[in-house]
Amino acid sequence: LMSRFGVVDVPTGLDGFSGRHRAYVKVQDGCLLRCSYCIIPHVRPKLTSRPLEHIIDEVRRLTDAGHREVVLTGIHLGHYGVDWNRNKPREQWTRLSDLVRHLCELPGDFRIRLSSIEATEVTRSLIAAMTEYPDRLVPHVHLCLQSGSDSVLRRMRRRWGTRMFLDRCRLL
């Protein structure tokens, strides 16, 4: 959004959340979806994931500053890496679970938490990462549910219905 107004010198992250236990790291921005009610595709930039190295550097700065929990955030967190996956074979895709694994391997006494995520992005790979790092990755998942009615979800142009939502909850 800032680039639309000629602002190109945008900070890559925050150095601290002074006096706070929890810090927030935005790992992606934008959204590919066009839900009927949503203005985000019109006011946010196209889907863009931050480079892994930048995120790792920011997490290190924050944990070195004493933050004990880092919350990964994004407009559509589950789409982290999707912008890099075009024209790549599926086995070479970058996913949110890859980012989580890299961050969980960093040294230090801190935990990783995921902010809100879509039910369709609760993948077996993400669940496996949660299982692999139970002491590092907070066992908390905030799934978005705008309606419990399939007809309302269709009118909203959501990519899933109540059955898929419940199936993903059962996976957890």
Language-model-derived ranges and their functions:
Residues 1-83, 163-171:
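Proteins enriched for Cys/Gly/acidic motifs involved in redox and nucleic-acid/cofactor modification
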Residues 64-172:
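Conserved SAM/AdoMet-binding glycine-rich loop
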